[in-house]
Amino acid sequence: KDFQAQAMEDALGEGTSPVLHGDKLIIVVDHELQSFVVAIDKHTGNEIWKTHRDEVSNWTTPRIYRYDGQDRIVINGSSVCAYDLNTGRFLWKCGGQSLSAIPMPAVGHGLAFAASGWRKDKVHAIRLGQMGDLTDSKSIAWSLDRGAPYVPCPMLWGDELYLLEDSSFFSCVRANDGHR
């Protein structure tokens, strides 16, 4: 499948990794023109669905998770967004991240953990199962304004979320409330 040349910021090119789930290969293409997420049939290479995204260049890998019996996708960006894995239907978004997001979100404890640390530090813990625009809502369980990684992914291990900020600041917070 040829997606043609895309207008990436600083000519860095794609940095997202495709994710395979069942027969679907999920690919995120966030760039300076029309960004999108697409599901490709792994057997035929045919497009199953394609959903446009209101994003500029990001280099994040999508995270697939299951909630309430449904497979879903959460993708980091200037807004963290979730989509239905089977249809590509937009479910929710939460703004407030920095531009040029790279870390893949972590999911667990009924939360999506998204981090972005370029030009401003932000870590959000977003309650799953919501719909629509969650920015500045009670759907944000907690957030941090320091120690967010620019490149490394947050890692959820048991009840703890580990964050490695790019200048070697390592932190561990409780997943349920963000306290250190």
Feature locations, PLM:
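Conserved loop/turn at the beginning of each blade in beta-propeller domains
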Residues: 10-11, 33, 55, 98, ...
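Asp-box/WD-like beta-propeller blade repeats and closely related beta-sheet repeat scaffolds
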Residues: 1-30, 40, 48-51
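Active-site neighborhood of glycoside hydrolase catalytic domains
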Residues: 36, 42-44, 52-58, 69, ...
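Repeat-blade elements of multi-bladed beta-propeller folds
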Residues: 13-29, 58-80, 101-123, 148-169
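Glycine- and Gly-Pro-enriched alpha-helical subdomains that act as flexible
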Residues: 164, 171, 178-180
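Short loop/turn segments that connect beta-strands within beta-propeller blades
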Residues: 41-44, 84-88, 127-132, 174-177
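Structural motif
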Residues: 34-38, 82-84, 120-127, 168-174
